[in-house]
């Protein structure tokens, strides 16, 4: 394993997280207010222990849930239950549809970095973005299309923090190589998302494993 590269990856992820936090702090000082009513909805993916009023379970996930939010003056805000009911009369399905429209436009503007081994074979892809909608883009067709040529139809995805998405072709051996480093990214995160591993394909997204469990 290339430990110097993994150290670089952890530092790079930390700087991206700090940049994300700094951007949110700068937005909070703007004099122009951004109303919740005019802000695009954000499908948040977050640790289960974080509290919010509007939550939806992720299939087979034990530590991660969906939540409903939007971008406000101080960063990502959660919808209160009553606010959510007033804004989305048709419920979660309406909210998710609108949130993914925004996420689709975000993923279209992102170029992944492909990490390769010494022979030039792609190990995994890295996405870094300070846009809070980037994480929910994993639920879009455009996200799957972006990686289909290199990784096929079944994607394994890790989302350690709000600024980072790691994507690889389904395969236990490849994941085991980087499992410890990916889990450390989750532990070091200012805005953690998930310690779980997700399978994404045309059928949807669901959890298939946990980065904390020992490699096999």
Could you tell me what each predicted segment is?
Residues 169-216:
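C-terminal structured domains
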Residues 23-132:
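Charged, alpha-helical interface segments at or near domain boundaries
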Residues 1-6:
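Bacterial N-terminal signal peptides that target proteins for export
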Residues 145-146, 153-155:
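Generic recognition of flexible, low-complexity loop/linker segments
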Residues 156-160:
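Short beta-strand
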Residues 163-169:
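Short cationic amphipathic helices and targeting signals
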Residues 134-148:
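Short amphipathic alpha-helix segments
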């Amino acid at each position: 394993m290339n430990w110097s590269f993994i150290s670089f990856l952890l530092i790079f992820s930390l700087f991206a997280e700090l940049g994300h936090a700094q951007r949110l702090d700068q937005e909070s000082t703007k004099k122009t207010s951004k109303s919740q009513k005019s802000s695009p909805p954000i499908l948040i993916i977050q640790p289960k222990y974080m509290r919010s009023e509007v939550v939806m379970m992720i299939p087979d996930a034990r530590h991660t849930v969906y939540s409903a939010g939007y971008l406000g003056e101080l960063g990502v805000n959660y919808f209160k239950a009553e606010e959510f009911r007033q804004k989305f009369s048709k419920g979660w399905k309406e909210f998710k549809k609108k949130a993914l429209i925004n996420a689709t436009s975000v993923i279209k503007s992102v170029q992944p970095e492909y990490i390769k081994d010494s022979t030039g074979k792609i190990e995994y892809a890295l996405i870094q973005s300070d846009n809070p909608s980037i994480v929910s883009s994993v639920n879009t067709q455009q996200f799957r299309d972006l990686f289909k040529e290199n990784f096929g139809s079944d994607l394994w995805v890790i989302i350690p923090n709000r600024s980072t998405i790691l994507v690889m072709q389904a395969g236990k051996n490849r994941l085991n190589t980087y499992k410890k480093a990916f889990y450390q990214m989750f532990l070091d995160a200012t805005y953690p998302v998930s310690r779980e591993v997700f399978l994404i394909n045309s059928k949807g997204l669901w959890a298939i494993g946990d980065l904390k469990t020992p490699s096999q």
